[in-house]
Amino acid sequence: MYTAGEEEIEAIARVIRSGALFRYGENSECNRFEARYARHLGVEHFALAASGTYGLAAGLIGLGIGPGDEVLVPAHTYMATATAVLSVGAIPVIVDIDESLTIDPAALRDAIGPRTKAVIPVHMWGAACNMNAIMDIAKKRGLLVLEDVCQGIGGGYEGKKLGSIGHAGAYSFNYFKNMTSGEGGGIATSDPKVAERARCAIDPCHFYWQGRSDSIKPFAGIGARASELMGAMLNVQLDRLDGIIEAMRAEKKKVLAGTRHLGNLGLTPSPMNSPDDDCAAQVMYLLPSEQAAQTFSKTIPSVIAGKTGRHNFTQWDQVLMHEGAHHPALNPYTLPENKGLRLTYADDLGKGSLDILNRTVMIAMNPAHGDADIDDMIHNIDAAARVALENASLDDVEVRKAAPVDLQKFDSVN
């Protein structure tokens, strides 16, 4: 969470004082947010859910994904991207990333099989995927595209908001995201049928609220409704979002400019697919070796992408162990409909991805940073680069005081 204050407190207090915490009622905060956020994204429909994970699941349900289908997911994303696929009875197929830390379009194209139905491009750490290439491949091969925007809220790609480019987009409003209500999520689309199915997945009583005759064919959903408390806080957070993103973009621009000379040492900024539309939540650098990345991250507060726990496929126990459901009879890996799908994961899976991840370091931006904070960050990056890439001694460099890495946010592991 970057910013929250009296406005959020007052908005939540107003809902509590009203006694109307259920989202279906007059002057609904949730309805207001859904309409406002849909306009912000440039889509026709937005539906709130209890979490980003359920937003992903609702998006898959909305698109008609289920048993018998494969869904392509990147090797670097929070495990919920893959487990959401399992939750609808489909099988996740893991695809390599490129140096942007997003799904590699060439690897995506090569991974398409006869029963591949969809792809989930993940705008990881707020960095946009190469959506032009992905949408071109999807159109030619008949794939559905569900953007995972859980970490990319506020970002865009070539002038379009993330999540508005594919057939649907899933969002998270978890505490660690660019816009937050503590927990929460949602699904965006301009397809009314996808929106209706997603809303029915989120709320098993959705059919009743609008009248049975006006709804689609009913199916059993799971209650993942938002509350008015979520809607109230998000309406305030939405007012803050553009300012948060603008501040981080300005900071990142200064940091990249101030460290450009370090490319001569081997500290290379990670490539971006649409840098002007970047969320700018992180500055990412690619180093020449794992050892250099480790030395860099030990010198100043920073995170190695390959050490972010369940953001890497090697930590997805439910997937790798084929434990895809709470009951054996529902396990997608043993469903007869999934016979013939790619159910196993090779021992050498993702070697290229792991090499990139273990050589990429990330430094978090923060809209609260002032000029002095940014100057200190640039100074520290210079110092860490000298230690990691020129074998300078820690005694030979000055490391200025900096905030520690939020290990909980990054699920960081040693």
Give residue spans per PLM region.
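N-terminal "arm"/small-domain region of PLP-dependent enzymes with the aminotransferase-like
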Residues: 1-22, 143, 362-364
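Conserved PLP cofactor-binding pocket of PLP-dependent enzymes
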Residues: 206-212, 254, 258, 297-361, ...
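Active-site region of PLP-dependent enzymes
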Residues: 152-158, 165-282
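Phosphate-binding glycine-rich loop
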Residues: 22-70, 84-86, 94, 160
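Conserved PLP-binding active-site segment of the aspartate aminotransferase-like
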Residues: 271-274, 278-291, 308-329, 358-372
